[in-house]
UniProtKB/Swiss-Prot annotation:
Region described as Disordered: 178-205
SUPFAM superfamilies in the record: Ribosomal protein L25-like
Protein name: Large ribosomal subunit protein bL25
Signal sequence annotation: none
GO cellular component terms, semicolon-separated: cytosolic large ribosomal subunit
Gene coding for it: rplY
UniProt record, GO biological process: translation
Amino acid sequence: MADIIHLKAEQRTEFGKGAARRIRRDDKVPAVMYGHDHDPIHVTLDGHATLLALRTENPLLSIEIEGQKPMLALPKDVQRDVLKGFVRHVDLLTVRRGEKVDVNVALRITGESAPGTIAMTEFNEIEVQADLLNIPEVIEIDVTGLEAGTTIYLGDLKLPEGTSLLGDAEDVAATVAFPETEPVEDEESAGEDAQGESEEKAAKE
């Protein structure tokens, strides 16, 4: 079961770039909450707490606005400062317990393929549908002992219970191959090339 991260929020009535700058100066993050059964709710979150919460992939958040019932939410769009890394803005999708949600989950290679080969994923992450309280942190691809030329398709992946693939099952998830090597020039050829270049240069002089 997913851990729920609790974040306190303040509802805000000021909008626009100027208001957003003032919020960030106070080490807070402007955010908007939207869902199927309510109008967008504009809130302000604590900057440090939000940064820590977003270190987790697909964190399930409980947004607690004073005087209101806490609302479960998933971050759907996170804007970060390119240079300093702090969170500039967050879009939050409100959800309900028992609901299935569409999320992107990272792929990770596990195990070692056959000696002399390497395994590579075709995607950093894939889109799946999962139970709200059981969103996988990562989907592993076991390549133990696989030989060069092996192809693993999305449909081959072992997904956790309650999780289903949203992409094309025939898309390639990972491949096993021999690493590409640079052609090595032998010393004799290299010497002949160098001598030829020297003679050509001398002739021009």
